[in-house]
Swiss-Prot record:
GO cellular component, one term: cytosol
Signal sequence bounds: none
Name used for this protein in its record: UPF0246 protein lpg1366
GO annotation terms (biological process): response to hydroperoxide
Origin species: Legionella pneumophila subsp. pneumophila (strain Philadelphia 1 / ATCC 33152 / DSM 7513)
Length: 257
């Protein structure tokens, strides 16, 4: 099984030091094409592109200007698993993982990325911001979906082909998962959702659903889950699988308040 997450906008200023072997992003050459485009953007253009404040636009302008293309794109880089911070990654809590859990995740967990396309947990990346949904003109079209869709879908098929149970588990946001061409996926896809129930009313609350996605990914990695039936047994933070509102391709969990 391969589990997919979205990245986070918020990054740790100082990532956890990881002394064991790390990896380079599989699609680094493609990512550097986008970096070259972003290096030509002014602070104002970056602010407009991603709807950022001047302060955040200046930060990301500096990030792209300092992005090392010639000598070593891995300079000032950190494993993706430890660099991302945010609701999903609070639930994931990767700093608490054992080394063997991190090693297992390297071939069973993926992070979709606007800049890097697809990341494994130990892929070293430079701090950046580039959401998948932005309309960044590039050689492939008017947005990042045009740039990444075929490439990312192909890499997912390649990784799934190496799995003992080749099922794609989608814990990514709609914005990010749109990059996957579902018609070109060669293997089954299962999406997992989390809902809150109060007074018999079901709601998906963004911040809570994001944290739950991270908790589910942690559960799958730490327990080396390799079947849909095992996923259904997830019960952290009061979430329980609900058969009535689920289907073979959509597993829905409810927490009652």
């Amino acid at each position: 099984m391969l589990t997919l997450l979205s990245p986070a906008k918020k990054l740790l200023s100082i990532s956890k030091h990881y002394s064991k072997e790390t990896s380079n992003p599989l699609l680094l050459d493609k990512a550097l094409q986008l970096v070259k485009i972003m290096k030509l953007k002014s602070v104002e253009q970056i602010a407009d592109l991603m709807d950022l404040s001047k302060q955040l636009a200046e930060l990301n302008y500096e990030r792209y200007q300092n992005f090392d293309l010639k000598n070593n794109p891995m300079n000032h880089s950190y494993p993706a698993l430890f660099l991302f911070q945010g609701d999903v990654y609070q639930g994931l809590n990767a700093n608490s993982w054992k080394d063997e859990e991190i090693e297992y995740a390297q071939s069973h967990l993926g992070i979709l990325s606007g800049l890097y396309g697809f990341l494994r947990p130990l892929d070293r990346i430079q701090p950046y911001r580039l959401e998948m949904g932005v309309n960044l003109e590039n050689p492939a079209g008017k947005n990042l979906y045009a740039f990444w869709s075929k490439i990312v879908t192909n890499i997912l098929n390649q990784i799934l082909a190496e799995q003992s149970n080749p099922v794609l588990i989608n814990l990514a946001s709609t914005e990010y998962f749109k990059v996957v061409d579902e018609k070109k996926l060669s293997y089954p896809l299962v999406t997992i959702n989390f809902y809150e129930q109060k007074n018999s009313e079901l709601k998906m609350i963004g911040i809570l659903a994001k944290k739950a996605r991270g908790m589910m990914a942690k559960y799958i990695m730490q327990n080396r889950i390799d079947s849909i039936e095992q996923i259904k047994e997830f019960s952290e933070s009061g979430y329980l699988f609900n058969k009535e509102i689920s289907s073979p391709n959509s597993l829905n969990f409810i927490r009652i308040h």
